[in-house]
């Protein structure tokens, strides 16, 4: 089973990397770009875990390690 985890900065948190990428895109002529936010994409391959235990484990992994929940949000998708 595969789990895709998306980690993004919370609204209102300054994203200096996103601002630098936006500036570079404008320099390259992509002036229509209004904003850039940079995040993380993580793929997990898991053995068989079912139902509530699976959700619980994924949330625990994100809260303990994969995301800094003070400044980041996360969401995930499960592909069985």
How would you label these PLM feature ranges?
Residues 48-51:
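Helix N-cap motif at beta-to-alpha junctions
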